[in-house]
Amino acid sequence: IEYLKECLPSMDQDPAKRLRKILEKRGVTFHLQSAATAIINKTVLFEHKGENQTVESDLILMATGRTPNTNGIGLDTVGIDYDRHGIKTDDNLMTSVPDIYAIGDVNGRQMLAHAAEMQGRQVVDHLLGIKRHYRPDLVPSAVFTYPELAAVGPTEQQLKAEGRKYKVYKSSFRSNGRAVLMCTTEGLVK
């Protein structure tokens, strides 16, 4: 049950849609543009286009996104500015209190371990007077499904929305020798 038009809305929609179709062939049912309204035992109630529906399941996994875990870490005590999106920081990841930095999940930027590592390096470099240009748009992300879905850089939809010129290159795994030998030709590189 997905609220938006496509599963994996933060990923490029071309490979996300392709993954959805592969999973549907394997028996996964998607209810897109639907809003879960309640869970009663093993039944999920949801609304789709104004119509109430239900789905029964042996197991329910609810993924509602990530939120910065800033509760109970004393932000108010030291006067650090934050909101529901996380601790507010400048370009060097310094908080509203000089010499206190926020990296990783608490700043609400990219909630990925390797992004936190890069942010940590950025802070250390800043403290040492080394200029580092951190490119959050080039932090890779992955969805560990089969086949896997991975991305780095902006999506085609983001580029269109920003009015940026771009070229799209695609290569099917059907032309990849390793994929052919392993009988895993469903993938693509975009």
Regions found by a protein language model. Name each.
Residues 28-29, 43, 58-60, 99-101, ...:
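Structural motif
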Residues 3, 11, 33-35, 63-65, ...:
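Fold-independent oxyanion-binding glycine-rich loops
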Residues 1-41, 45-51, 110-117, 125-158:
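Rossmann-like dinucleotide-binding cores of NAD(P)H-dependent redox enzymes
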Residues 105-112, 145, 174-181:
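Glycine-rich phosphate/pyrophosphate-binding beta-alpha loops
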Residues 54-127:
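FAD-site-proximal beta/loop scaffold in flavoenzymes
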Residues 40-42, 97, 183-187:
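A short, glycine/Asx- and small/polar-enriched loop/turn
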Residues 53-82, 151-190:
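C-terminal catalytic lobe of FAD-dependent flavoproteins
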